[in-house]
Amino acid sequence: MMRSLFSGVSGMQNHQTRMDVIGNNVANVNTTGFKRGRVNFQDLISQQLSAAARPNEEVGGVNPKEVGLGVLIASIDTVHTQGALQTTGINTDVSIQGSGFFVLKSGEKTFFTRAGAFGVDNAGTLVNPANGMRVQGWMAQDVAGERLINSSAQTQDLVIPIGQKIDAQQTSTVHYACNLDKRLPELAADANEADVRKSTWTTDFQVYDSFGQQHTLQINFSRVPGTNNQWQATVAVDPGTEVDTQTRVGVGTSDGAANTFIVNFDNFGHLASVTDTAGNVTGPTGQVLLEASYDVVGANPDDAGQVTRHAFTLNLGEIGTARNTITQFAERSTTKAYRQDGYAMGYLENFKIDQSGVITGVYSNGVSQDIGQLALAGFANQGGLEKAGENTYVQSNNSGIANISTSGVMGKGKLIAGTLEMSNVDLTDQFTDMIITQKGFQAGAKTIQTSDTMLDTVLSLKR
């Protein structure tokens, strides 16, 4: 039989396989995170009719005479180029811009995917809603009062507990900065109520006790008569209420015996020192820290049977600078900056995912707290991954071991929430390959037809 018959058959068979791959690509043109396949051919073994001969003194060298026996599929590759990103606006949809794979688990088996169309089940677990596979990452933990994520630990299921309560936190530090107008008049001994209002700068802030109950922290500033660049500050928590909270303030770690202190400024309008009623004075440099406290109404007595008091630090800023501190300039009195770290009890209402994959919970009390972080996997040879269906891959002998870490580490891409990665199939390329494949298939068929005709010619010689 003619060798060309079998060459034609191999050509048709392998072009059919290439057409199968193209058809699968076209079918998945709108599949989230799909990566197109590509078929490469190589020639089959060749039959040697005569070997090569080296040149000698009489004649030159002769090349070998070989007849190829057809075509063979060299590889069917998965092309992991970046797909376009589609905006969805859904906060559980996440795409990877760059290399890397999301890590999923089903039982004890680990899968990898580029399709980040995730959702939250009724237990709060972040999953692939199409198959229930659980998204892997690291949950945040409370360590010494801080929320920390240990990305070097073993990955775990990510849980986003919508509706979960967060405990109230009492205020521990109040950072305060303002400008006191140097032009403000001194308060006369016989001043009336209108004069007091005109000569006093009053600021009100909100602080929280251990129950999460909100209290008003009021500080009144007035110039000390007869003394340049000196102001008296009076501190009160919940002023004007029926119950006196017995507010006290002092320099250092002592809350003092009264609720007033003296603020001194230098000739440049910068904070110079603070003196409490006991005569304690702050140092010449560094932060000005005062200890304030007040009675917590409604709290159980302490171990000594005394009224429970809530103590917090009042940070007035740094001596000798105008940045984030109290100043005295000839400008209108203003509160330039204020913040405190207490809050009431709240419920987890929403969450967001940043480029590092950190999931931040947004609570009803305005607090934002880290919940966890998405894990990404990288491979030495991502083309060696085996497809496992449902837009997932599994590790193979030639992919290398999964290197799991956060985004941006060891070449991994960044995460973009509210988007999905589209298929990287280009229909223009696929239809062009389809035409080329069809012509290759037809050429193989033509080879068989021509070989058949030649055999008929040979058989007709006997007639």
From Swiss-Prot:
GO terms classed as biological process: bacterial-type flagellum-dependent swarming motility
Record family assignment: Belongs to the flagella basal body rod proteins family.
Predominant place of localization: other
SUPFAM superfamilies given in the database record: Flagellar hook protein flgE
Chain's gene name: flgE
Gene3D superfamilies (alphabetical): Flagellar hook protein FlgE
Name of the protein described by the UniProt record: Flagellar hook protein FlgE
Location in or out of the cell: Bacterial flagellum basal body
UniProt xrefs under InterPro entries: Falgellar_hook_FlgE_sf, Flag_bb_rod_N, Flagellar_basal_body_rod_CS, Flagellar_FlgE/F/G, Flg_bb/hook_C_dom, FlgE/F/G-like, FlgE_D2, LlgE_F_G-like_D1
Organism per entry: Treponema pallidum (strain Nichols)
PANTHER family for the chain: FLAGELLAR HOOK PROTEIN FLGE, FLAGELLAR PROTEIN
PROSITE patterns recorded: FLAGELLA_BB_ROD
Pfam families associated with the record: Flg_bb_rod, Flg_bbr_C, FlgE_D2, LlgE_F_G_D1
Key words of the record: Bacterial flagellum
Bilayer-spanning residue ranges: none
Keyword Oxidoreductase among record annotations: no
A cellular component term, taken from the record's GO annotations: cytosol
